[in-house]
A protein has these predicted regions:
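Active-site cleft segment of glycoside hydrolase catalytic domains centered on the general acid/base Glu
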Residues: 21-90, 94-111, 136-152, 182-187, ...
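Substrate-binding cleft of secreted/luminal carbohydrate-active enzymes
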Residues: 171-172, 187-223
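Short, well-ordered coil/turn segments that N-cap beta-strands
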Residues: 4-8, 49-54, 86-91, 121-124, ...
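Glycine-centered loop-to-beta-strand initiation motif
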Residues: 256-268, 273
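Active-site beta-loop-alpha junctions enriched in small/polar residues
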Residues: 13-16, 57-60, 97-100, 128-133, ...
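Conserved, mostly hydrophobic/aromatic
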Residues: 44, 55, 82, 126, ...
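Catalytic cores of secreted or luminal carbohydrate-active enzymes
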Residues: 230-249
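Structured interaction patches on ligand/partner-binding surfaces of diverse proteins
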Residues: 280-291
Length: 291
């Protein structure tokens, strides 16, 4: 990954759940747990210093039902530890909620992020998930029966999230289908394409992460057919559709003669640009520009 200069992030420093992710040897004493959590974050920070620059700090802090006994205020403390043990130039994110949740939970999430930042926690991005774990729901969406996956409601919820004044990542996307048939592959592709267009169009959304890269690679209990690749790592139609959006439809490429006044105007997507021109002395100049 490092050789190929891929841009990637760590999910997640503290994935705290008694049922699934805490080791059996973990003490139930809050003070002992707090020391273990800090030691864990310190070790990860030391091991990957300078190698990974984008970090989800705490996963799903809104849902406390399956957390069991936890250190007091562990979400805030986790950010403070991360700020202490990681380089200053890395980004820290939240990874929480689901766009299909009701608006009350979305607003609660906004309150949590505001509380963290008001107390000095470094929260650079606000992550929100969108999992369709019920495969037949994707067929319904393709047929216009949206239910809790309403695009209009998703868009409205993103505006509520933007009240936290943080850029938004759609941090985990699952679009599953019941079978690996050609028709279900096409349904997955069309639903994925439409939701990606929706998220890309929102001014606060700065990134999207697909959750399960290949079929059959999900956490136990999650649907089998939810990847961009099949189980043999062959690209599926969804992969090609998203590649077309990201690398072609959503990139501004053009070449024009230099205007007489030397002032070039254009309308393009937000992001990084490489401007190449030839100066009066015939030299080629390359500039990096952010719109």
């Amino acid at each position: 990954m490092l050789k190929n200069k891929l841009d990637y992030k760590w999910v997640v420093l503290l994935l705290v759940s008694i049922a699934y992710f805490l080791p059996e040897w973990m003490s139930e004493d809050r003070e002992v747990m707090e020391k273990e959590f800090e030691a864990h974050i310190k070790e990860i920070g030391k091991r990957y210093k300078g190698r990974i620059h984008n970090w989800d700090v705490v996963n799903e802090c809104l849902d406390q039902a399956n957390r069991g006994i936890m250190p007091d205020d562990y979400t805030y403390k986790s950010y403070r530890w991360a700020m202490k043990y990681f380089p200053k130039n890395v980004t820290f994110n939240t990874n929480e909620c689901n766009l299909r949740y009701d608006i009350t939970k979305i607003r609660r999430y906004v309150e949590i992020v505001r509380d963290l930042t008001d107390r000095g926690a470094k929260v650079d991005y606000m992550g929100v998930q969108m999992h369709i774990f019920k495969p037949y729901a994707t067929r319904d969406i393709a047929a216009g029966k949206f239910g809790i996956y309403s695009p209009t409601e998703f868009y409205d919820k993103l505006y509520v999230m933007s009240e936290a004044e943080r850029p938004i990542f759609v941090s985990e996307v699952t679009i599953s289908v019941p079978t690996d048939s050609d028709s279900d592959r096409e349904i997955q592709m069309n639903v994925a394409k439409d939701y990606y267009r929706l998220w890309f169009s929102h001014p606060s959304v700065v990134g999207i992460t697909w959750w399960n890269l290949a079929d059959g690679g999900a956490v136990a209990g999650e649907p089998s057919y939810s990847g961009l690749f099949d189980a043999d790592m062959n690209p599926k139609p969804s992969y090609y559709a998203l590649e077309q959006l990201i690398n072609h439809e959503w990139k501004t490429r053009f070449s024009v003669p230099a205007p007489a006044d030397g002032l070039l105007k254009f309308r393009g997507f937000k992001g990084g640009y490489k401007v190449i021109y030839t100066d009066k002395k015939g030299r080629q100049v390359v500039l990096d520009y952010t719109l």
